[in-house]
Amino acid sequence: MRVLPQHRDIVQKLRQLMRELAPDTREVLTYGILAWRANRIVAVLSPTKKDITLAFSRGASFEDKYGLLQGVGKVSKNLKLKDVKEIKKTVVAYYVKQALAADAK
């Protein structure tokens, strides 16, 4: 997975948080992008020129009390991160917990 230098710290932080918040998932490369799998793909991390996208496979069904989920898809929703300072553990944990619950169904 190719990541621009200005986004590497974001990727590193998200990988660290996923290891901590979703220890039973496996980090895998799928179609050249980083993903976390439990029963199915739970989340996908994809770099763009502008930001890093953390997409949740069933994010459209999530509660979104922070109003941060984006995307027009009927199933997947994502967080767009441009700076490591935007990453708040409690916020990521809120969405990851829902992703794991959706995967367990």
Task: Report the location of each language-model feature.
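Charge-dense, helix-prone N-terminal extensions
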Residues: 1-105
